[in-house]
Swiss-Prot record:
This is Small ribosomal subunit protein uS2. Signal peptide: none annotated. One of its GO terms (biological process) is translation. It comes from the Bacteria. Pfam families: Ribosomal_S2 (PF00318). It comes from Synechococcus sp. (strain CC9605).
């Protein structure tokens, strides 16, 4: 049985690529045709790739691999947080901060600081500080929650990065490749399939397309970990 059907992908608009002038020739094998100056993705190829991605991701989850979902564009931000939470993955959905992977020691210190501030807030310790000092601490807390909130349970580097927009998240791609962390990537027609281990050719701009693909990948992670793909709020990343 197919992980995702052609009808589902058509309905989600997963077949719409970018304008032909913006294409990457390396994506040619995944392109069906050009229509009105826009490349149309071959959804038969997408279905095959999605089946492979599902099996690969499920196998990785079954062997205890930890996942990081990355997607900071407006269309992906909410979906990334929801689907990552559903399968117990960590996530970045606001802005990729330089060194999130390659400077992990420093990043972990910032995450620890976030946890400390959250404890202070919940215990009332911040409220007991002088007004000005309390305001400074709350601003720091809000900033750290915005950018690092999805990483609180990531105690070490991820084993797999799941990516929504390769071009936008180029720094994440560079850092993952530098550390030999495999990438499962949604690839629009302007992307480079050579920069990921598990390609999924599809529209990475439409909310429904992003939701469909990430939803299935979250299902694969839950199935690998729990033997079922309907888990909610799966295990936290260790």
């Amino acid at each position: 049985m197919a992980v995702v059907t052609l009808a589902e992908m058509m309905e989600a608009g997963a077949h719409f690529g970018h304008q032909t002038r913006r294409w990457n020739p390396k994506m040619s094998r995944y392109i069906y045709c050009a229509r009105n100056g826009v490349h149309i993705i071959d959804l038969v190829q997408t279905a095959v790739c999605m089946n492979n991605a599902y099996k690969w991701t499920r196998s990785a989850a079954r062997s205890g691999k930890r996942f990081l979902f990355v997607g900071t564009k407006k269309q992906a931000s909410e979906v990334v947080a929801l689907e990552a939470a559903r399968c117990g993955a960590s996530y970045v959905n606001q802005r990729w901060l330089g060194g999130m992977l390659t400077n992990w020691t420093t990043m972990k210190a910032r995450i620890d600081r976030l946890k400390d501030l959250e404890r202070m807030e919940s215990s009332g310790a911040i409220a007991m500080r002088p007004k000005k000092e309390g305001a400074v601490l709350r601003r720091e807390l809000e900033r750290l929650q915005k950018y690092l909130g999805g990483l609180k349970n990531m105690r070490r580097l991820p084993d797999v990065v799941v990516l929504v927009d390769q071009r936008r998240e180029s720094n994440a791609v560079l850092e993952a490749r530098k550390l030999d962390i495999p990438l499962v990537s949604m690839l629009d027609t302007n992307c480079d399939p050579d920069l990921c281990e598990v390609p999924i050719p599809c529209n990475d701009d439409a909310v429904r397309s992003v939701q469909l693909i990430l939803g299935r990948l979250a299902d694969a992670i839950n199935e690998g970990r729990h033997g079922s793909n309907d888990q909610r709020g799966g295990d936290s990343e260790g």
